[in-house]
Design a protein with these regions (language model features):
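Short, flexible coil/linker segments at or flanking structured domains
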Residues: 2, 26, 42, 49-51, ...
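Amphipathic, interaction-prone secondary-structure segments
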Residues: 48-96
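Conserved non-transmembrane functional hotspots
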Residues: 26-28, 68, 140
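Contiguous, amphipathic alpha-helical segments that mediate oligomerization or scaffolding
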Residues: 16-57
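Non-transmembrane, amphipathic alpha-helical segments
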Residues: 2, 27, 31-35, 64, ...
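Intrinsically disordered, low-complexity regulatory segments enriched in Ser/Thr/Pro
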Residues: 1, 75-126
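Intrinsically disordered, low-complexity regulatory regions enriched in serine/threonine/proline
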Residues: 2-18, 22, 105-142
Length: 142
C-alpha cells in the first residue's frame, strides 16, 4: 500500500473526527442553554406548585436548587428525591429526572426522561407535571 494513500485516509479520518467533535460541542452548548431556560420557565414553577400541593396534602417535600439544578426532596429521607438533570448521553440531549428512592437499606437510583424522545425546547408545563406525578407515585403510596 502506498504511503500517500495511507496519509490521505488518516487525514480524512482526522478531519471527520474534528468536525464531529465541533458539532457535538455546539449541540451540547445549545442544549445547556435550552435546559437553563427549561429550568427557569417550566420546571421550577411547576415543581414549586407540586411541592405546595404535597404540603397541603400532608406530604412533606422541600424544593431546593443545588448548584443551579432543581431538586424536590422528601423530608423523611435524605436519599429520597427527584432531581432534574440534563441527559446528554443519547443522540438528542434531553431534560430528565434523577429519581432516588430508599427502601430499607437499598437505594434505587434511576434517570428517566421528562418526555421520552422530546427535545428540551418542545417540553410543556403539562409534560413536567405528568413526569412529576409519575415520579412521585412511590412516595404517594406510603
Amino acid at each position: 500500500m502506498e504511503v500517500s494513500h495511507v496519509n490521505k485516509r488518516v487525514t480524512m479520518a482526522i478531519e471527520r473526527a474534528r468536525a464531529s467533535a465541533q458539532t457535538r460541542r455546539q449541540t451540547a452548548a445549545s442544549a445547556e442553554k435550552a435546559y437553563g431556560v427549561f429550568l427557569e420557565t417550566l420546571a421550577t414553577p411547576v415543581t414549586r406548585q407540586v411541592a405546595n400541593a404535597l404540603k397541603v396534602a400532608g406530604i412533606a417535600f422541600t424544593l431546593g436548587t443545588p448548584g443551579g439544578g432543581l431538586r424536590l426532596a422528601a423530608d423523611r429521607g435524605r436519599d429520597d428525591f427527584i432531581e432534574f438533570v440534563l441527559d446528554a448521553s443519547g443522540d438528542i440531549p434531553q431534560a430528565a429526572g434523577r429519581i432516588s428512592l430508599s427502601r430499607g437499606s437499598r437505594t434505587i437510583d434511576e434517570v428517566v426522561p421528562v418526555k421520552p424522545g422530546a427535545a428540551i425546547e418542545e417540553l410543556t408545563e403539562e409534560d413536567v407535571l405528568e413526569f412529576l406525578v409519575r415520579a412521585l407515585e412511590p412516595w404517594l403510596e406510603r
